[in-house]
Amino acid sequence: MKNLIAELLFKLAQKEEESKELCAQVEALEIIVTAMLRNMAQNDQQRLIDQVEGALYEVKPDASIPDDDTELLRNYVKKLLKHPRQ
């Protein structure tokens, strides 16, 4: 029983580490996108936003992906493009 608990705790720690790494990657990408948007002319920003939104609209997610997840992604992309980090 102790071995099972120790193994589960070890796996949990691994998952937590993976989660932290993914969070760091997302934060880094947010910073990069924000910096890029801030250094673009307004019309270039709008063109990029339109292209990204168009690409998202055309993508048909796999049936195994819940609609809520797809909507979450679309909303987050929209938020990042229209209201970048402060």
UniProtKB/Swiss-Prot annotation:
Q: Which biological process annotations from GO are given for this protein?
A: cellular response to starvation
Source organism, top-level taxon? Bacteria
Sections of the chain in a coiled coil: 1-36
Q: Name one GO cellular component term.
A: cytoplasm
The main location is cytoplasm
Q: Which InterPro entries match?
A: SigmaS_Anti-adapt_IraP
Where's it found, cell-wise? Cytoplasm
Q: Which UniProt keywords apply?
A: Coiled coil, Cytoplasm, Stress response
Q: What does this protein do?
A: Inhibits RpoS proteolysis by regulating RssB activity, thereby increasing the stability of the sigma stress factor RpoS especially during phosphate starvation, but also in stationary phase and during nitrogen starvation. Its effect on RpoS stability is due to its interaction with RssB, which probably blocks the interaction of RssB with RpoS, and the consequent delivery of the RssB-RpoS complex to the ClpXP protein degradation pathway.
As for family, the record states: Belongs to the IraP family.
> Quaternary structure?
Interacts with RssB.
Could you identify this protein by its name?
A: Anti-adapter protein IraP
Q: What species does this protein belong to?
A: Escherichia coli (strain SMS-3-5 / SECEC)
Q: Which gene encodes it?
A: iraP
